[in-house]
Design a protein with these regions (language model features):
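Conserved N-terminal catalytic core of the sugar/cofactor nucleotidyltransferase
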Residues: 1-92, 103
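Conserved core of the sugar-phosphate nucleotidyltransferase
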Residues: 29, 97-166
């Protein structure tokens, strides 16, 4: 979903920092084309496979083994050779948010900083139910914002000079 979101904004080159279960990620990408294509298997004479679809996604994806227990900075350092030396974006694999990538990049460029990190105020963990003795729910109170603090929302824009600090 993250790659489709970036692609919708015209960003189609990805470097994925692989660690835990990287073999599953690599297999998924290796099979992605076949899983999403119309295919004819011709076993009559030539035993060939014909894939009928054209390009599914306009993506170039590089998968890099960055280690099992490596922290974020170490992962960035390990993929440096696969980056083109320009401003790059970083998103955590569990990053699901309504972020306008073009606006994020424009904000980053307009402020001239080495790094821009999206921030969010997390909601409380649970909504509150008022329940009568017979089991009827009489009120539902939405989760409250915790303490008003901000957390890293997982979408970042970084300048190549960040490598000097890692």
């Amino acid at each position: 979903h993250i790659m489709k979101m970036y692609s919708a904004y015209g960003f189609n080159e990805f470097v994925i920092c692989c660690g835990y279960k990287q073999h599953v990620i690599k297999e998924w990408f290796a099979d992605y084309y076949l899983q999403n294509s119309n295919i004819t298997f011709d076993f009559t004479q030539e035993n060939k496979m014909i894939v009928h679809n054209n390009v599914l996604e306009p993506w170039k994806v590089t998968l890099v083994d960055t280690g099992l227990n490596t922290m974020t900075g170490g992962r960035i350092k390990r993929v440096k050779e696969y980056l083109d030396g320009n401003t790059f974006m970083l998103t955590y694999g569990d990053g699901v948010a309504d972020v306008n990538i073009k606006e994020l990049l424009e904000y980053h460029r307009s402020h001239g900083k080495m790094a821009t990190i999206t921030a969010a105020q997390p909601g409380g963990r649970f909504g509150i139910l008022d329940i009568e003795n017979d089991g009827t729910i009489t009120n539902f109170k939405e989760k409250k914002k915790e303490d008003g603090g901000w957390i890293n929302a997982g979408f970042m824009v970084l300048e190549p000079s960040i490598m000097d600090l890692i």
